[in-house]
């Protein structure tokens, strides 16, 4: 049986990357909340 996680950096960045986050209102909310918590990594 095939596993559910098949790693791919392109797909990872397109779905969870910074530009993907900034492209929607809710994604910008995620970035701002992570900035307010002073996260060292904002997104992938």
Curated annotation (Swiss-Prot):
Pfam families for the chain: Ribosomal_L34 (PF00468)
Domain of life of the organism encoding this protein: Bacteria
GO process annotations (BP): translation
Gene3D superfamilies registered for this protein in UniProt: 1.10.287.3980
Keywords annotated in UniProt: Ribonucleoprotein, Ribosomal protein
GO CC entries: ribonucleoprotein complex; ribosome
GO MF, one example: structural constituent of ribosome
Family: Belongs to the bacterial ribosomal protein bL34 family.
PANTHER family hit by this protein: LARGE RIBOSOMAL SUBUNIT PROTEIN BL34M, MITOCHONDRIAL RIBOSOMAL PROTEIN 34 FAMILY MEMBER
Name listed for the protein in its UniProt record: Large ribosomal subunit protein bL34
Organism: Buchnera aphidicola subsp. Cinara cedri (strain Cc)
Organism taxonomic ancestry: Bacteria, Pseudomonadati, Pseudomonadota, Gammaproteobacteria, Enterobacterales
């Amino acid at each position: 049986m095939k596993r559910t996680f098949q790693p791919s950096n392109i797909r990872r960045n397109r779905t969870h990357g910074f530009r993907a986050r900034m492209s929607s209102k809710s994604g910008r909310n995620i970035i701002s909340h992570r900035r307010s918590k002073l996260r060292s990594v904002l997104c992938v």
